[in-house]
Regions:
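Conserved H-loop
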Residues: 137-144, 146-152
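Conserved ABC ATPase signature
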Residues: 85-89
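Hydrophobic anchor residue at the start of the ABC signature
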Residues: 98-99
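ABC ATPase nucleotide-binding domain signature region
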Residues: 4-55
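Helical segment within the ABC ATPase nucleotide-binding domain
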Residues: 124-136
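ABC-family nucleotide-binding domains
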Residues: 113, 119-120
Length: 178
C-alpha cells in the first residue's frame, strides 16, 4: 500500500523521487484503486460516481455500454446497483465495480492495490481474464501479496519482500496455467 501510494503520488518519499514513465513519456494519466475500495466512492451512489467521472471527462462515455456488459460478466447488474451507495454494497461487488469502472477511464496506468483481496477463486479467475483484455490499451501496476495471481498475469515482478539495501529483484513473467 505504501509503494502504491508513492507511485500514485499520495505519499512522498523521505528522499529521492518516484517517476513512472512509459516509453519515455512521463506526463501520464494515472488512476489508483486503493485496497479499501470504499475510500474512492465514500457515501456516493455508483451512479453519482460514474456521473462525476463523466462530467470531469475521466470516464470514457463511448464505453458506457461495454462497461455495463463487463459488469454483467461478473454477475453485477447496473440497474440493481446504480442507486446504491458504495458503503451499502457487498465489499467484493464494490471492488469489482470500481475496478471495471476505472478500466473504462482515460488512464495510461492504473495502479491496483490488493485487487484480489476478499474475492473468491472464480472471481479471481474472471478478474485475471478481464485484466488481460484491458492490457491491450492500459498499463497496470499491481501491488499484491497474492503471488499466484501476480505471477500468472504480470510481465515483470518486483518482489519487495526480497528487497535489500542494494537492489530490487525483477523477475520476468513465469508461465502458469491460466
Amino acid at each position: 500500500t505504501t509503494f502504491a501510494g508513492l507511485c500514485f503520488g499520495d505519499l512522498s518519499p523521505t528522499s529521492g523521487k518516484v517517476d513512472i514513465s512509459i516509453s519515455g513519456k512521463k506526463d501520464l494519466n494515472v488512476g489508483y484503486l486503493d485496497q479499501f475500495p470504499e475510500h474512492l466512492i465514500l457515501l456516493k451512489t455508483t451512479n453519482e460516481l460514474v456521473t462525476e467521472l463523466k462530467e470531469n471527462q475521466i470516464f470514457d462515455s463511448s464505453l458506457d455500454r461495454t462497461f455495463r456488459k463487463r459488469l454483467n460478466r461478473f454477475g453485477i447488474q447496473w440497474d440493481h446497483i446504480s442507486n446504491t451507495k458504495g458503503v451499502d454494497l457487498p465489499w467484493a461487488v464494490l471492488r469489482i465495480f470500481l475496478l471495471i469502472l476505472l478500466c473504462h477511464c482515460r488512464f495510461d496506468v492504473l495502479i491496483l492495490d490488493e485487487p484480489t483481496f476478499g474475492l473468491g477463486w472464480d472471481q479471481r479467475v474472471k478478474l485475471r481474464s478481464f485484466i488481460r483484455e484491458c492490457m491491450n490499451h492500459l498499463h497496470f501496476m499491481i501491488v499484491s501479496h497474492d503471488k499466484v495471481f501476480i505471477r500468472s498475469i504480470c510481465q515483470q515482478v518486483i518482489d519487495l519482500d526480497e528487497l535489500d539495501s542494494k537492489h530490487v529483484r525483477i523477475r520476468e513473467k513465469e508461465t502458469t496455467k491460466p
